[in-house]
Design a protein with these regions (language model features):
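Extended basic-aromatic, gly/pro-enriched interface segments that bind polyanionic ligands
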Residues: 110, 131-225, 250-252
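Conserved SAM-binding loop of SAM-dependent methyltransferases across substrates and taxa
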Residues: 114-133
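Conserved class I S-adenosyl-L-methionine
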Residues: 102-120, 141
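Conserved AdoMet
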Residues: 2-108
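Core SAM-dependent methyltransferase catalytic element
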Residues: 252-271
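Conserved beta-strand signature within the Rossmann-like core of class I S-adenosyl-L-methionine
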Residues: 239-247
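A short glycine-rich, Lys/Arg-flanked "PGG" loop and its adjoining helix->strand segment in the class I
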Residues: 226-239
């Protein structure tokens, strides 16, 4: 697929999926590969043929939508974010929970890919923070639209490149080095519940002290869908809870009841 054809096709189809072209500039070639594979499977010869196919087969939009999700993740991605979570956010939330007589901190990792983000959070809590708050238990819900990504997260086995940002001592302590790669130990998997879920259609019923929504809604969704998603996230946050977005992402304009905790790290607090 030539780039000019791919760009024109994405600029046509993405708005119909409530996605925005600007979020796909850097990852568009990965989407091209998926679309090209789909064309071959359908016996189509060009993106023009595929566009015609979409117009006569509305069920194909679901397939195209799934082709537009590009998981890019690794452990401890954006080191400064996890340092701020360690030094400020999680201790503050733990103290808040203690003051309310609670024994559980609830976290939600959205677009968790193969589990790198929620497991990083589990490592951070168990290796750096838990000793300060021995009566507090961290539980993490990790969701992703991709059932194959969730299956990989359940296996918990990763190539060395996924762990390159982790402190060396954490790799030694929390992973078994196997022939397949680095397998995270069960005690660090235990706090994490993995679930296939599309945030555009379903959100959990419970509320959370910490929500991480990085490099998903505020990169790929269009303005209206971003605003709707943010309203739902705020509704699912505890008062005083924290929302973490991706490096370089911005929240949509409007009154959502959030105040900056660290704008540099993309962390906000529900007022």
């Amino acid at each position: 697929m030539r780039d000019v054809e791919g760009v024109q096709f994405l600029q046509w189809c993405l708005p119909r999926l409530q996605l925005r072209w600007s979020g796909y500039r850097k990852v568009r070639r990965q989407v091209y590969k998926r679309i090209s594979a789909r064309l071959q499977l359908l016996g189509l010869h060009s993106v023009a043929d595929y566009r015609s196919y979409l117009e006569t087969h509305p069920e194909e939009w679901e397939v195209l939508d799934s082709s537009c999700w590009i998981p890019i993740s690794r452990f401890y991605r954006d080191k400064g974010v996890f340092q701020f979570l360690e030094q400020e956010v999680l201790p503050s939330l733990a103290r808040q929970a203690l003051a309310q007589g609670k024994s559980v901190l609830r976290c939600w990792s959205i677009g968790c890919a193969a589990g790198e983000e929620p497991y990083s959070l589990s490592l951070l809590w168990k290796l750096k923070i838990q000793a300060q708050f021995p009566t507090i238990r961290l539980v993490i819900l990790a969701t992703d639209i991709d059932d194959q990504a969730i299956a990989r997260a359940q296996q918990g086995c990763y190539p060395p490149s996924s762990l390159k940002d982790l402190p060396e001592s954490w790799r030694t302590q929390a992973f078994d080095h196997t022939a397949e790669g680095f397998r995270i130990k069960q005690e660090y998997q235990e706090p994490v519940t993995l679930l296939v879920q599309d945030i555009r259609r379903t959100v959990p019923e419970e509320t959370f002290h910490l929500i991480l929504c990085r490099y998903l809604a505020f990169t790929y969704f269009d303005a209206a869908l971003q605003s709707n998603t943010l309203r739902q996230l705020v509704e699912r946050m505890q008062i005083g809870g924290a929302l973490v977005i991706g490096n370089g992402e911005t929240l949509p304009e409007g009154e959502f009841g959030l105040i900056p905790w660290s704008e540099k790290e993309g962390i906000y607090r529900r007022a």
